[in-house]
Amino acid sequence: MAANNCIFSLSGRGLKLESKEEVLSVIKELISEKNIREIYLNGNTLSVEACQILGEVIRTKKDLEVVDFSDIFTGRSAKEIPFALEYLLSGLSSCEKCSTVYLSDNAFGSTASEPLIAFLSRHRPLKHLYLTNNGLGPSAGACVARALEELAEIQSLDPPVHLETLVCGRNRLENASMKAWSACFRAQNKLTHVKMPQNGIQSQGIRILLETGLTACSLLQTLDLQDNTFTLLGAKTLAKMLPKWPHLIELAVSDCLLSRTGGKLLAQALFDNNFMQLKILRLQYNGIDEEGVKILANAIERTLPSIELLELNGNVFSEEDESVEKIRRIFEKREKGVVDDLDDMEELSEMDSSEELSEPENSDDSSKNFDDIEEKKVEFPIKKETGTNISTLLEETHLV
């Protein structure tokens, strides 16, 4: 049954909804239930007409708190998606309690991002936003960041509301959007969970993001920047900024090429500061050597009492290193904590032992002006279709 305890779900059913008749046949419970709090449409593909009807129905759900619009446009053309998204978000904008929005795995690109930007800049209730794998790129990504910065001003009005969760991964945000994102984080400084993995951000962009943006978010509990390229410059910046986030529960920087020296700097920062709540530490594939893991083991012993998961696979020390054994003994004594399987450890080459993977601070696109990406004012027209009146349509089908 689709509706259950104020939840309506079509999640993962693989429906291809084209006509009004097809849509209305599967949303009867959604229409009839007055107190819907959560709607899950993910894993289906919706036409423009389907989204128009759904948008009008969603508009009536005044208790709505959570919507999942992930993966709802598979097989839809680039011309369809902007109009379909506009209908959905237009309806959602009337739901004054809707604080959690999932929009991942939809090919918005630059064109379909326009109705998204318009929605994000003015949906005051927004607290949790999930926006991963949307093909934004640096230009549209910067516009999304500026929309959230604009939203912060609206949310500051009494009574204040704050964005708490931002997940924006696999969107090719790159260095060119980092100043916009930094401004966003300065404005949205009550964030507790930030995940931006796999965005092609290089070391200069990482430095901008950490130094001038995320440093303002003193309440951070989760920071995930996995699979971006830190190298030594980014690792130095992370180590320097780490004390700004005393409430961290999860720090995820696997696949970031921290480098041997960078790994030691990060481990030392963990040792020098008490992260009493840190439970998850992801450090895979970062070139961390036996000296780095030795410092890390000391940190776990003295300043990281709550660690439950430590990921170290793919680094350049032996799985039987005495520091690894020390960490395992600490976890055993505490009766909590686990190290991942160290089954893909790297060997330290002669080149690695004599050279650090780093770059001068004026390299890596630092000569580019990252300020020249401006947010465009969005005025996205709704394509009106003659003869379509949703209220009349619903009355005719005896569903209202």
Language-model features, listed with the residues they occupy:
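Leucine-rich tandem repeat or coiled-coil scaffolds
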Residues: 1-400
